[in-house]
Amino acid sequence: MGSGSEGKAVFYLSHCPKPMENPMSAQLKPSEIVRQLSQHVIGQEDAKRTLAVAIYAHFRRMAANVAIDSVELTKSNILLIGPTGTGKTLLCETLARILDVPFVTADATSLAQTQFVGDEIEAILHRLLDRASDDIDRAQRGIVFVDEVDKLKAIGGEARATSGESVQHALLKIMEGAPVRLKDGRHIDTTNILFICGGAFVGLDHILTQTHTFGFISTTGGDDHKILERLNARVKPTDLLEFGLIPEFAGRLPIVTRLHDLTQDMLIRILTEPKNAIYRQFRAMLAADGVDLQIEPTVFRQMAELAIEYKAGARSLRGIFEEMMTDVMYAVPDNPGIRRVVIRSLFERAEMSTG
């Protein structure tokens, strides 16, 4: 295990989906995928590389749509492990935009709370069809991100939570890659739909500590500690079983990669560097009104510190920034003479001037 299209009233059913009509996704090399991801996602370089290689292999397989040298090419779904706010959903959303494929998210916790799991699972495919504008061929090449799958674990590590296990089995039916008949009579083949699952997996590190015994490995040179650290951080199938995933579900997630807590420097970069960075958005909005927005570096550091204190990672940054800008965005429309806004501290009022 690594760490590491649809017209209305179309009834298309095939165990071997048609070759890709737009092969551009298959032409993207892993390095190009990483480059484009990095324009929107700060940090998590290992996860980017793992995802890029997996996506490259996935779309190459779809483009070929045949066995190569008599070797059958099968789909490999992905598991992202990392704390809240580390960028799991953003990575998946950005990947879908880069690849120009329909994308939907699902919350495993919500699935576990319903008495009609099958209906909710079918609803995921219906939403994928909606995102594909009812183009079945396009939907069959989409991406589904199922978050918080760690919440489907067994209770106490022994007796399995019935609802959690039943959701895992229900998800398996669409993850395994087979034609699914929807209640409206249409069929959708999930063979080429890529499923990416995510979760914090709190407590997994304890399992890794207890089950990994790579201390016997010996190397020459000074990299012994780094090698052992990488090996011991690698998630094995048995670790996921110990955590509470059923063998069949864990087996459908052969590619596993970990995301790590964001540092203060990473959070500052998230505020300022990406194409859609919140700072850039507000500068552009105010510039449209002829106002120049300047924020001192200290303010970004203060926002990053607050996000770390909230323990919500990058997810909390927008709320912090929006709150800081409330007074400014309230004042500017009523005062067309304002031409410059300077913010020197997160905890002080902004300076607004006409010059």
Annotate each predicted stretch with a short phrase.
Residues 13, 21-43, 48-104, 108-355:
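AAA+ P-loop NTPase nucleotide-binding core of proteostasis motors
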Residues 2-7:
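Residue-identity detector for glycine
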